[in-house]
Amino acid sequence: MTQAQNYVIPPGSKVLVTGANGYIASHIVKALLDLGYLVRGTVRTPMPWLAEYFERQCGLGRFELIVVSDFQQPDAFDESVKGVSGVIHVAQGLPSSTAAETVKSATAYTVNGVINLFKAASTQRTIQRVVLTSSIVAAGYPTGKGFKLDADSWDESLEQASKDGTTVPIYRACKIEGERQAWKWVEKNQPHFELNSVLPWLTLGKILHPNIGGSTMGYVSGLLRGDTTPFKFLPLPWFVDVEDTARLHAIALLNPSVRSERLFATAAPFTWGDVIEILKRIQPNNARIPAAPIQEEPTLGDVVPAARAEKLLRETFGQLGWTPLEVSLESGIARE
């Protein structure tokens, strides 16, 4: 990464990462530890295996866990924000039984968690930056060729649904409102900290520990066992490697040129045919890998801010560019 004296937050400082046992969050923790930071991670229940993992990887005394079981409590984050210089809010605050929830109550649940964290952070003058993990769906999920997303794009499906009586998937609705209300809260309350967000698309790549859910990489790994569930992801998404996504979170936290910005973690379009071809090349004797869908086409368009994110990865971490699909898949199925 660029020289430490340029960081907004100096190495050796402590950073809070929520939902530290998650697929993306665990990579963010590792990226920060590798850069010389101390990390406090929140989990909903005690997870000693996670602390043991990072101690083995990065040394004693550099990573600590704190249990935050209910984001809905107004004081949920009061203890966890003490003594930290930055916050990365990754944990998706969803009700435990989302199928039984209305979209309205589910989004309120998510937004409450975000606002409770922001309020707690605003009481700690040591906190200089807060980074929110959003999703590409907050900007607007493309439906076909020729789409264009820019830094000011917002998904309008919730507004449309209220007009025509349709429903929006809960995950999508929560990501839209979670990020939108985060920016509105900052605009209204003018806290001392700066806010940036990161919007990943379909995230692939290495899973750090067997106890960490593989999220979208888990679906793709299922193809090795003949599970064709990923073929239902339509229109076809773009992919991004999980380490690239984690590094963009670090950039959003530390890079002085990234201010009140949305970083789009979107590498390139792909087809499931591309994925199947790569998987068969990696495991040529695996007869359970299914045939690719017929007549599929990549979702071609323009994610304008992706060029900015790729440039930041090159400048900050010395990467040649986005991690290629094949490299991401190889690392993602290494345990399979």
Curated annotation (Swiss-Prot):
GO terms for molecular function: oxidoreductase activity, acting on the CH-OH group of donors, NAD or NADP as acceptor. It comes from the Eukaryota. It holds the Pfam family Epimerase. This is Ketoreductase adrE. NADP(+) binds at residue 171. Keywords: Oxidoreductase. The keyword Oxidoreductase applies. Its EC number is 1.1.1.-. It comes from Penicillium roqueforti. The keyword Transcription regulation does not apply. Disruption phenotype: Drastically reduces the production of andrastin A. Belongs to the NAD(P)-dependent epimerase/dehydratase family. Dihydroflavonol-4-reductase subfamily. The lineage of its organism: Eukaryota, Fungi, Dikarya, Ascomycota, Pezizomycotina. Pathway: Secondary metabolite biosynthesis; terpenoid biosynthesis. One of its GO terms (biological process) is terpenoid biosynthetic process. InterPro entries: Epimerase_deHydtase, NAD(P)-bd_dom_sf, NAD(P)_dehydrat-like. Ketoreductase; part of the gene cluster that mediates the biosynthesis of andrastins, meroterpenoid compounds that exhibit inhibitory activity against ras farnesyltransferase, suggesting that they could be promising leads for antitumor agents. The first step of the pathway is the synthesis of 3,5-dimethylorsellinic acid (DMOA) by the polyketide synthase adrD via condensation of one acetyl-CoA starter unit with 3 malonyl-CoA units and 2 methylations. DMAO is then converted to farnesyl-DMAO by the prenyltransferase adrG.
